[in-house]
Amino acid sequence: MQIIEGKLQLQGNERVAILTSRFNHIITDRLKEGAMDCFKRHGGDEKLLDIVLVPGAYELPLILDKLLESEKYDGVCVLGAIIRGGTPHFDYVSAEATKGIASAMLKYSMPVSFGVLTTDNIEQAIERAGSKAGNKGFEAMSTLIELLSLCQTLKG
């Protein structure tokens, strides 16, 4: 039996984009910082890292599709923060963003990590953006790094 898994180390030549929504920027800025930190700590070259900003989480799938279609990137780390309010808006935005991101990843068969927070309140978002629950941006980039390695291994 063979166990195949990705390594948490970049070669240093991977071109990566961090796609981030600006809405709830107090949270998403911290997620982005965590992702950038992880990229650098695990051998990424800052010159090969692009930050792409969109207005909100609903716009993430369209721009992710454009980034993957361009074939400019080896992978994309997608970040955002959708916080539940008093209307069903949260449900619509989170469902469509999630479906759209997964759809683009499968359409192009490219490594994409999902770091879009969906929380019931601002406190939960803050916890996941660098306090009690760690930084989910850092975790999303870690996932992307492993995916990049695993895809390269499976490619042969």
UniProtKB/Swiss-Prot annotation:
The gene is ribH. The lineage of its organism: Bacteria, Pseudomonadati, Campylobacterota, Epsilonproteobacteria, Campylobacterales. Keywords: Riboflavin biosynthesis, Transferase. It is an enzyme of class 2 (transferase). One of its GO terms (cellular component) is riboflavin synthase complex. GO terms for biological process: riboflavin biosynthetic process. NCBIfam families: lumazine-synth (TIGR00114). Catalyzes the formation of 6,7-dimethyl-8-ribityllumazine by condensation of 5-amino-6-(D-ribitylamino)uracil with 3,4-dihydroxy-2-butanone 4-phosphate. This is the penultimate step in the biosynthesis of riboflavin. It catalyses: (2S)-2-hydroxy-3-oxobutyl phosphate + 5-amino-6-(D-ribitylamino)uracil = 6,7-dimethyl-8-(1-D-ribityl)lumazine + phosphate + 2 H2O + H(+). HAMAP family: Lumazine_synth. 5-amino-6-(D-ribitylamino)uracil binds at F23, A57, Y58, E59, A81, I82, I83, F114. This is 6,7-dimethyl-8-ribityllumazine synthase.
